[in-house]
């Protein structure tokens, strides 16, 4: 298949592109390198440095003929969605609409979309199934939910003259190799690892009892690939998480332990909470198990060990 991976130089997208190349697909990657890096693009993929907000750039790719799109690109910082909401809006909604319009124009039959657990907001329903009402509490969550609805509403249009099959994945806290270690606004586990590698204190925003559901990158890729040609996944929205949660304080302890440090020696500090943060998140992955035959396979301790080994092997970069 000819498959476009948007955001394919980034953390999640590059792992998607790598698996697709390994599976024998012809892969095109487009990325603006705002957070991605060209060296993440797998050998064998055709790389275009460009932006999903640039429809002319995308048109050159779509016009060559595509069988599927893995739409992973987006503005991914919850904090930046508050400080620069126009960029969040332009990238997450505008970029997605560009992709959708070109899918229709060039009759691309398959689209998989990277949604987010932030669409649920501060729900008391834990673990959270997909049918839970979406009440996002951050601008980022709003744009991800709006883009998700654009995806599915487009596929459900009665005036389409071809079958446009879409699937969305509400991904929880994804971690693993190639995660940003130098971006203070993206990925708490990567932030903590970067802090320790640079000899900085680990900063916990809030009291540390808030919890997150951490899912290893290989498990995420497995789910996407399993859905690609699965007719039962067409039109579906699936949670992708481990089904377990850790408090942020527990996460810090795990990261310190992975560096053979105690909390005291690791200089753990606290700061006021930030806007838009969900209190607790935990995925109900029953639907993904049933429809995709998918199961998260990588235990947290194993995934953290793999991520730590990778993090200690890459050149240190100053925090952004």
Where are each of the predicted segments found?
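N-terminal Rossmann-like NAD(P)+-binding domain of SDR-like oxidoreductases, especially those catalyzing
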Residues: 1-174, 268, 314, 320
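C-terminal substrate-binding subdomain of Rossmann-fold SDR/epimerase-dehydratase oxidoreductases
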Residues: 16, 196-320
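Activation loop
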Residues: 37, 43-44, 116, 124, ...
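Residue-level signal for the nucleotide or nucleotide-sugar donor/cofactor binding architecture
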Residues: 53, 83, 91-94, 131, ...
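Residues in well-ordered alpha-helical elements
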Residues: 56-59, 67, 79, 86, ...
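A conserved pocket-lining segment of Rossmann-fold NAD(P)-dependent short-chain dehydrogenase/reductase
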Residues: 81, 161, 166, 170-180, ...
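Active-site "substrate specificity/gating" loop of NAD(P)-dependent dehydrogenases
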Residues: 122-123, 139, 180, 184, ...
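Hydrophobic alpha-helix immediately C-terminal to the catalytic Tyr-X-X-X-Lys motif of short-chain
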Residues: 146, 150, 154, 188, ...
